[in-house]
C-alpha cells in the first residue's frame, strides 16, 4: 500500500516532469529551427 504522502509527491512530480520535457523539447526545436539544422 502506497502512503498518501508518497502518492501526493508522485502525482505532483509527474505533471512537472511532463511540462519540463515539453519545454525542453520546444526550446531545442526552436533553437534547431533558428540554426537551420
From Swiss-Prot:
Keyword check for Transport, yes or no.
Answer: yes
* Superkingdom of the organism of origin: Eukaryota
Kindly list the GO CC terms recorded for this protein.
cytochrome b6f complex; plastid membrane; thylakoid membrane
Q: Provide the alphabetized UniProt keywords.
A: Electron transport, Membrane, Photosynthesis, Plastid, Transmembrane, Transmembrane helix, Transport
Chain ranges passing through the membrane: 5-25
Entry membrane topology: Single-pass membrane protein
- Which is one Pfam family of this protein? PetG
Any single GO BP term: photosynthesis
Question: Key word Transferase present in the record?
Answer: no
Described purpose of this protein according to its UniProt entry: Component of the cytochrome b6-f complex, which mediates electron transfer between photosystem II (PSII) and photosystem I (PSI), cyclic electron flow around PSI, and state transitions. PetG is required for either the stability or assembly of the cytochrome b6-f complex.
Q: What is this protein called?
A: Cytochrome b6-f complex subunit 5
Name its species: Cuscuta obtusiflora
Amino acid at each position: 500500500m502506497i502512503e498518501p504522502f508518497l502518492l501526493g509527491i508522485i502525482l505532483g512530480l509527474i505533471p512537472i516532469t511532463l511540462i519540463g520535457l515539453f519545454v525542453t523539447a520546444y526550446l531545442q526545436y526552436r533553437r534547431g529551427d533558428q540554426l537551420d539544422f
